[in-house]
């Protein structure tokens, strides 16, 4: 979510002026800056004071765009959810149901987290410690949606089993645990251990 947010250089002969962001621009800038701050390995809890200082505005200016810091994090969770569900739709639209579809979903979600370390901290809940509990509840609901899709992908994979429903549920649960474990390791290592490390070999062991 990062991009250059600096104003264009001003002509040296004219007095410096501060551009007023267009509607929605400042809101996006706040979310981008918050995401960038979460990408710093070992970063502590982000305060609104630090966020405002990074952007170069007052804390009051932040609250003209968001009612609370929790609402800022909800904006990041919205981005994570839209991105994850969009990636899942890409897979389900192109590939038939089965174990390979489920593994492809895991692969894309891990790649997304690797490219967006700040969002990875949101997905694991690491960035939400000491924040409003509803934020973690929203992330939990997202993980429930992902697990439900994994079950859907695996639905026909155990038709010859004596306990197909249990097998689907257990396999989907193990896959989600693998996903979360990789994300948590990425965060704990200061983003040094990549979620996609030895990915294909690891994924194949999930369906042996």
Task: Describe every region a protein language model picked out.
Residues 44-50:
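Ser/Thr-centered, proline-biased regulatory motifs
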Residues 1-25:
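N-terminal intrinsically disordered/low-complexity leader segments
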Residues 25-36, 40, 54, 71-94, ...:
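Alpha-helical structural segments
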Residues 56-66:
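Short hydrophobic/aromatic patch on the recognition helix
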Residues 120-125, 136, 140, 158-204:
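Hydrophobic/aromatic-rich alpha-helical bundle segments in the mid-to-C-terminal region
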Residues 66, 125-131:
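Short helix-capping/turn signature of helix-turn-helix
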Residues 52-53, 133:
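Helix-turn-helix DNA-binding module
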């Amino acid at each position: 979510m990062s991009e250059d947010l600096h104003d264009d250089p001003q002509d040296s002969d004219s007095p410096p002026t501060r551009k007023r962001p267009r509607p929605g621009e400042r809101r996006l800038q706040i979310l981008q800056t918050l995401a960038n701050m979460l990408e710093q390995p070992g970063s502590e809890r982000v305060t609104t004071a630090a966020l405002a200082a990074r952007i170069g505005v007052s804390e009051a200016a932040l609250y003209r765009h968001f009612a609370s810091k929790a609402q800022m994090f909800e904006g990041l969770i919205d981005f994570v959810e839209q991105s994850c569900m969009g990636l899942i739709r890409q897979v389900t639209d192109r590939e038939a149901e089965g174990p390979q579809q489920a593994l492809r979903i895991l692969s894309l979600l891990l790649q997304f987290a690797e490219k967006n370390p700040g969002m990875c901290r949101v997905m694991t809940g690491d960035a939400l410690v000491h924040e409003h509990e509803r934020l973690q509840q929203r992330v939990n609901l997202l993980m429930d949606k992902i697990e439900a899709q994994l079950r859907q992908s695996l639905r026909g994979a155990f038709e010859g089993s004596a306990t197909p429903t249990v097998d689907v549920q257990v396999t989907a649960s193990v896959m989600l645990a693998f996903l979360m474990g990789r994300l948590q390791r990425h965060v704990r290592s200061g983003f040094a251990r990549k979620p996609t490390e030895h990915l294909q070999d690891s994924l194949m062991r999930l369906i042996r």
